[in-house]
């Protein structure tokens, strides 16, 4: 199964990351002001990807993974987050390298009125960073 073609992406991938999450974890929405784009792929389990267009307020969700093996491309202008619908292994490719000294991550709370009804849970497991968003 083909996962990705670099020639199909508008920008080159600069870094690939893996994340493992337990069912019920929400990674609250975040965005990148310097234009980092993300390509999301769930390798095992199921994940709900939630995207918010920060300019128009429009939202998009898709459940991806075992039952729907597709990748989701998110342009940098959009805020994005995910919910682990099952225990999962999640991969994301990004168009900028992460700089721990100057991170380009800006948060939006998981329960922001524009997206709070898009999650399947009302009592998620949140990291300290996501609780502080």
Task: Place the predicted regions along the sequence by residue.
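Non-catalytic, conserved peripheral segments adjacent to functional cores
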Residues: 1-70, 87-133
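Conserved SET/PR-domain catalytic core that frames the SAM/AdoMet-binding pocket
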Residues: 67-85
